[in-house]
């Protein structure tokens, strides 16, 4: 890929720091997780643009595409297994059809056996064809507030079930980011623990 680990880890720390600095306990419960994801995505895409990558919103999904147009990177919140070499990490929140199609595209290029079919048939109007040949890597991040660290890995998903990754072909464990030197990232009782490490999650309820 031609990227150094710091090109991926540093923006994530900066994004997390920015989200924490702007946090207010009066905001909706989902806003903090969304802010973390949004700030990390913004900082990451800004850094990768400097290195010749191009930011795109593919079907409204924010991605950075490599200079040769063969691969993309997506920042996604992970669970507590993130960046554990012997772990089995998953994305923290379920993902939709766009992500499922990206995983299916990865699987087509992979020789590893799979157990499910990810792609959803969106019909003739599907706009994914322009990016169908991209190999999409996931920059998985997890803020461990107990250890006061940010764990990250850059991994290639090739199977998923109901919006969650169930199989990775390759996982690159990135250096753990010690947050003890960032005083504004220290644990705060006012920061909702369940929102701290997640992407945004919406629940739709029918109202009669």
What are these model-predicted stretches?
Residues 1-31:
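Interdomain/boundary linker segments immediately adjacent to catalytic/signaling cores
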Residues 30, 48-78:
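A short acidic/basic microdomain associated with nuclease active sites
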Residues 33-37, 41:
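Nuclease catalytic cores
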Residues 37, 50-57, 128-131:
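Short linear motifs in intrinsically disordered
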Residues 77-81, 158-160:
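A short, sequence-level motif marking secondary-structure junctions
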Residues 83-149:
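Catalytic cores of nucleic-acid endonucleases
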Residues 128-208:
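Glycine-rich, aromatic-bearing surface loops/beta-hairpins
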């Amino acid at each position: 890929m031609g990227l150094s680990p710091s090109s991926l880890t540093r923006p994530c720390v900066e994004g997390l720091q920015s989200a924490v600095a702007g946090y207010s306990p009066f905001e909706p419960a989902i806003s903090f997780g969304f802010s973390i994801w949004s700030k990390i995505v913004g900082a990451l895409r800004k850094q990768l643009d400097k290195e010749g990558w191009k930011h795109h919103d593919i079907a409204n999904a924010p991605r950075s595409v490599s200079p040769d147009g063969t691969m993309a990177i997506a920042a996604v919140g992970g669970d507590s297994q993130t960046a554990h070499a012997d772990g089995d990490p998953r994305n923290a929140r379920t993902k939709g059809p766009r992500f499922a199609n990206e995983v299916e595209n990865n699987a087509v290029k992979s020789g590893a056996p799979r157990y499910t079919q990810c792609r959803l048939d969106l019909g003739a109007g599907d706009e994914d064809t322009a990016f169908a040949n991209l190999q999409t890597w996931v920059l998985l991040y997890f803020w461990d507030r107990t250890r006061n660290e940010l764990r990250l890995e850059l991994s290639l998903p090739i199977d998923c079930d109901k919006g969650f990754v169930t199989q990775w072909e390759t996982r690159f464990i990135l250096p753990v980011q010690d947050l003890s030197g960032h005083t504004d990232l220290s644990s705060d009782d006012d920061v909702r623990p369940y929102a701290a490490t997640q992407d945004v999650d919406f629940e739709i309820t029918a109202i009669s």
